[in-house]
């Protein structure tokens, strides 16, 4: 009977290990680093090509800029209007009215170093160009000389700085009867509102197709492409590339897939065009940051576009052609999100400002039905407690409470099986080596006593999707980035930095990298605690009598310790808390059923055998 208990525990442990090994295969651990702008790099970034309004009109010619050595030089090439709020700073270029300079003031590039903020957008002509352009494509009798393009220099009508309380107004006259106006606003977070109006002073009706595009040069995309390629044998846990909402469904296109789309000779690029309703949006998303075009109240074509010659990746929103009668003025409004993927912020835009399913821009993964409520609960707990580490522990307590009825039945079943140990010994004496008779008698005893020997595996099996979902939450949650816990844990999104090599955090030395020979010695304190708590949990039951089983059982905690040592410390904290609560639950339930676990005896049983 005791062997049955131990077999159940071993089976559960082996299943967990197989799941972890599968996880490592399909979701290899990546040393995820944001793409830093190399201030000394030389680039030949070109300005994005405006789309055509129809197949009958060619796209605007490729417009290139003078090669610049640094981001700062590229910024100085054009006249600018400052952008300033409590959360972002940067500028927009009067050339093309491009939003191409943006830093996120709440986020540092390095932990505890406020001197360098995360740079989201950078100008064309500099390294790692990443910018947003809005405009009109000509239709009918018009051509690109009649509309403002990426190199058009706008004049300032009003406003010399863009803030949440002060919009800016721009103007451009084509000197042929058309005057283009632009009003740009920003809220207190990351949402821009772009209002474009056209005054038709000609004697003819005109047709124009509004568009917005987000353009990135290769370095940003190739960094993500490299991560996707490094895991091409499996499935990378994080989507990076285009994310779009068609109004009815969410679609994703990886950076690595964009060059594989059908080639368009007219646009000299690889294209994928998806029809979207007036509830849709499209943009680029990464692990923590996102830029998104949101055409308001207008159906549009969502476009994924890759230009090999220019090494440029684009996401476009091509709106329906509008007609402006002679003597009339018409306005088109759209929004732009450019900022951090903060759960509370993007949920607000979705719930309160009508951006459909905007919260789904966070990559929830295959267990989204578990991940989403877990994500929401974790953030609620963090808002109440004020610390993500303690919020993870509180979440673990809630999960254990929800699963307690199953755990109770499981542990009661295990306790009752211990009570049947004397009867099992009698059956062994009675049937001897007749395994078939022994098995039949054992199953009859289980049925009579209403004991399920497999019940001990159920709580472990239920934890598998929970483990995957929590890992997903911790991996993609921006709020865990640079979030401290206690002691040496300053960033819950990365592995425990303590190790034997730095005397567990007492010395200011970094742990070796994942490819180092000494990585085996870089197991931190929290992974060690995880191994110890798992080992203690085992000691609630005597070791198996079978030597092979006993050896597997003995090594299991320490194998798990090394396997999970490279995971985010937030996940290891969950595992330690889960092991501790499971130990308390099992010990209490076993005592309530009249079974007194001999923990110390099980710990030192091996040594006693050696003495004898």
Describe the residue ranges of each PLM region:
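Helix-loop-helix
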Residues: 1-46, 92, 196-197, 209-225, ...
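General structural signal for secondary-structure boundaries
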Residues: 66-77, 84, 254, 259-262, ...
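Soluble non-transmembrane domains of integral membrane proteins
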Residues: 80, 84-357
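Intrinsic disorder/low-complexity detector
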Residues: 10, 40-42, 46-47, 57-58, ...
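Intrinsic low-complexity, intrinsically disordered segments enriched in polar/basic residues
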Residues: 5, 27, 38-40, 59-70, ...
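Juxtamembrane extramembrane loops of integral membrane proteins
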Residues: 25-121, 607-612
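Intrinsically disordered, low-complexity regulatory regions of eukaryotic regulatory proteins
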Residues: 1-2, 42, 54, 67, ...
């Amino acid at each position: 009977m005791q062997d049955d208990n131990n077999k159940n525990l071993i089976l559960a442990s082996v299943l967990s290990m197989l799941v972890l090994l599968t996880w490592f295969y399909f979701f290899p651990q990546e040393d995820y680093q944001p793409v830093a702008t190399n201030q000394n790099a030389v680039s030949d970034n070109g300005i994005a090509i405006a789309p055509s309004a129809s197949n009958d009109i060619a796209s605007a010619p490729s417009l290139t800029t003078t090669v610049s050595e640094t981001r700062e030089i590229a910024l100085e090439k054009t006249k600018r209007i400052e952008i300033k709020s409590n959360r972002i700073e940067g500028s927009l270029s009067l050339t093309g009215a491009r939003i191409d300079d943006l830093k996120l003031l709440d986020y540092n590039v390095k932990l505890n170093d406020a001197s360098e903020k995360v740079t989201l957008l950078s100008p064309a002509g500099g390294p790692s160009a990443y910018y947003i352009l809005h405009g009109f494509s000509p239709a009918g009798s018009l051509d690109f000389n009649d509309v403002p393009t990426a190199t058009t220099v706008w004049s300032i009508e009003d406003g010399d700085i863009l803030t949440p309380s002060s919009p800016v107004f721009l103007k451009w006259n084509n000197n042929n009867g058309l005057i283009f106006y632009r009003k740009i606003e920003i809220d207190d977070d990351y949402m821009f509102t772009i209002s474009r109006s056209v005054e038709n002073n000609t004697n003819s009706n005109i047709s124009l197709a509004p568009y917005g595009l987000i353009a990135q040069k290769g370095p940003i995309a190739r960094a993500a492409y490299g991560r996707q390629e490094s895991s091409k044998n499996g499935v990378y846990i994080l989507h990076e590339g285009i994310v779009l909402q068609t109004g009815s469904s969410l679609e994703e296109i990886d950076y690595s897939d964009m060059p594989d789309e059908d080639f368009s000779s007219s646009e000299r690029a690889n294209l994928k065009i998806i029809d979207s309703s007036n509830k849709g949006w499209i943009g680029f998303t990464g692990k923590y940051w996102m830029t998104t075009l949101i055409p308001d109240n207008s159906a549009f074509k969502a476009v994924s576009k890759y230009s090999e010659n220019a090494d440029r990746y684009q996401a476009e929103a091509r709106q329906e052609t509008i007609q402006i009668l002679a003597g009339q003025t018409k306005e088109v409004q759209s929004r732009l999100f450019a900022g951090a993927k903060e759960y509370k912020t993007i949920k607000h835009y979705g719930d309160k400002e009508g951006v459909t399913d905007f919260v789904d821009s966070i990559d929830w993964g295959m267990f989204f039905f578990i991940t989403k409520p877990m994500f929401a609960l974790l953030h609620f707990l963090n808002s109440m407690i004020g610390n993500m580490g303690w919020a993870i522990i509180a979440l673990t307590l809630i999960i254990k409470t929800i699963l307690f009825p199953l755990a109770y039945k499981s542990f009661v079943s295990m306790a009752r099986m211990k009570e049947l140990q004397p009867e099992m010994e009698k059956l062994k004496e009675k049937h001897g080596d007749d395994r078939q008779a022994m098995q039949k008698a054992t199953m009859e005893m289980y049925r009579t006593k209403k004991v399920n020997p497999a019940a001990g595996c159920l709580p472990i099996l239920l934890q598998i999707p929970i483990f995957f979902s929590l890992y997903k939450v911790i991996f993609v949650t921006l709020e865990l980035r640079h979030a401290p816990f206690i002691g040496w844990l300053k960033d819950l999104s990365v592995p425990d930095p303590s190790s034997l090599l730095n005397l567990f955090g007492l010395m200011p030395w970094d742990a070796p990298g994942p490819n180092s020979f000494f990585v085996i010695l870089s197991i931190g304190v929290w992974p060690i605690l995880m191994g110890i708590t798992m080992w203690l949990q085992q000691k609630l039951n005597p070791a198996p009598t079978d030597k092979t089983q006993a050896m597997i059982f003995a090594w299991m905690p320490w194998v798990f310790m090394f396997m999970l040592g490279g995971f985010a410390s937030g996940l290891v904290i969950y595992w330690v808390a889960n092991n501790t609560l499971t130990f308390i639950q099992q010990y209490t339930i076993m005592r309530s059923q009249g079974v007194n676990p001999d923990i110390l005896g099980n710990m030192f049983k091996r040594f006693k055998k050696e003495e004898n």
